[in-house]
UniProtKB/Swiss-Prot annotation:
GO terms for cellular component: cytoplasm. The gene is rtcA. PROSITE patterns: RTC. The keyword ATP-binding applies. It catalyses: a 3'-end 3'-phospho-ribonucleotide-RNA + ATP = a 3'-end 2',3'-cyclophospho-ribonucleotide-RNA + AMP + diphosphate. It is found in: Cytoplasm. The lineage of its organism: Archaea, Methanobacteriati, Methanobacteriota, Stenosarchaea group, Methanomicrobia. ATP binds at Q100, H300, L301, A302, D303, Q304. Its EC number is 6.5.1.4. Belongs to the RNA 3'-terminal cyclase family. Type 1 subfamily. PANTHER family: RNA 3' TERMINAL PHOSPHATE CYCLASE, RNA 3'-TERMINAL PHOSPHATE CYCLASE. This is RNA 3'-terminal phosphate cyclase. The active site is at H325 (tele-amp-histidine intermediate). Keywords: ATP-binding, Cytoplasm, Ligase, Nucleotide-binding.
Length: 355
């Protein structure tokens, strides 16, 4: 049995998500203690419980410690099976974080897994659904990952009501290397995309950033102003952009914007009292920071790629900063798999690799 101290490093829900996913893949029992110990509301929350319940259903696991506020979890998987599953997180629990708990395990399922999930699609402290679709899954395609996530309806805090459908096929993960083009080691589509992006940094107007600006129960000018502010700042930095505008009438009032280019993204959520222009600029500033660093992946994707790297083997990427989230994910992954990550600083960036 693997024992994981849930307070290690970043000490948040990601420790549990990665531990459970890798437990399912390896078939090793896991006990996680001190879950979210240093958080204002420690222990498991509703969205964690739903993720764990779903993981247990998919891999026929025995589980103990599944209750709100639980600081300890035992998870004993049997086999990752396929099938159809419906999950209602309740309120605005993050759909993307629930998927993060499952996705590393699903290539190893016996057959196709189909999910219908209700909850929050654009909520604080989690990737937006647009980021998952256009950055995370796009990068995972380079590993041979076979997954499609479809947005049916957005859900905002506090009532949620969003809906996403997802289909994941069993597949064999292949090694990947997301590096600067000057290292000249990449091949295929991913290399061509990186060449385009890196050449464009000398002439930023050649990089086109795409985005979606959206709002619910607000005047149509709100998502338009978010987009205009983002595009204006991007233009000042020399980047071309195209942003779709979406307006809805849903359960909760909310807004947000997600921008992406290659394997880098930027996003921001609106809130009461925060001008739409500030929301747009925050997303633009985030992606400009990533693109200007010349790193092929952004700091959030770098965190998410860790378990896939270990499962694929012989993989690497370069990122502008190694976050505590990523370092914690590395530690958890090394507890389950016979791998050792290496981190090297090169020309102001960090190369993370695993054999």
């Amino acid at each position: 049995m693997i024992e994981i101290d849930g307070s290690y490093g970043e000490g948040g829900g990601q420790v549990v998500r990665t531990a459970v996913a890798l437990s399912a893949v390896t078939g090793k029992d896991v006990k996680v203690t001190n879950i979210r110990k240093n958080r204002p509301n420690p222990g498991l929350k509703q969205q964690h419980l739903k993720a764990l319940e779903t993981a247990a259903r998919i891999c026929e696991a025995r589980v103990s410690g599944l209750f709100p506020g639980s600081s300890e979890l035992f998870f004993s998987p049997v086999e990752i099976k396929g099938g159809k599953y419906e999950v209602d997180i309740g309120t605005a629990g993050s759909i993307t974080l629930l998927l993060q708990s499952l996705m590393p395990a699903l290539p190893f399922a016996k057959e196709k897994v189909k999910l219908t999930i209700k909850g929050g699609t654009d909520v604080a402290w989690s990737p937006t659904i647009d980021y998952l679709q256009h950055v995370t899954l796009r990068a995972l395609e380079q590993l041979g990952y076979a997954g499609i996530v479809t947005l049916k309806k957005r859900g905002y805090y506090p009532r949620g009501g969003g809906e996403v459908s997802a289909v994941f096929e069993p597949c064999k993960l292949r090694s990947f290397h997301f590096r600067r083009v000057k290292e000249n080691r990449r091949t295929g589509e991913a290399r061509r995309e990186e060449e385009t992006r890196n050449e464009g940094r000398n002439q930023n107007q050649r990089i086109e950033i795409q985005g979606i600006s959206h709002a619910s129960n607000l005047p149509a000018h709100v998502p338009a102003r978010q987009a205009e502010a983002a595009e204006s700042l991007l233009l000042e930095a020399g980047y071309g952009s195209r942003t779709k505008i979406q307006s809805f009438e849903l359960l909760s009032t909310g807004s947000g914007i997600t921008l992406w280019s290659g394997y880098c993204g930027g996003s921001a959520l609106g809130k009461k009292g925060l001008p739409a222009e500030k929301v747009g600029r925050r997303a633009a500033e985030e992606i400009i920071l990533e693109l200007s660093s010349k790193a092929p992946v952004d700091v959030h994707l770098a965190d998410q790629l860790i378990p896939y790297m270990a499962l694929a083997g012989n993989s690497s990427y370069t990122v502008r900063e190694l976050t505590l989230h990523a370092a914690t994910n590395i530690w958890v992954t090394e507890q389950f798999l016979d791998v050792k990550f290496r981190i090297e600083e090169k020309e102001g960036l960090f190369e993370v690799s695993v054999d």
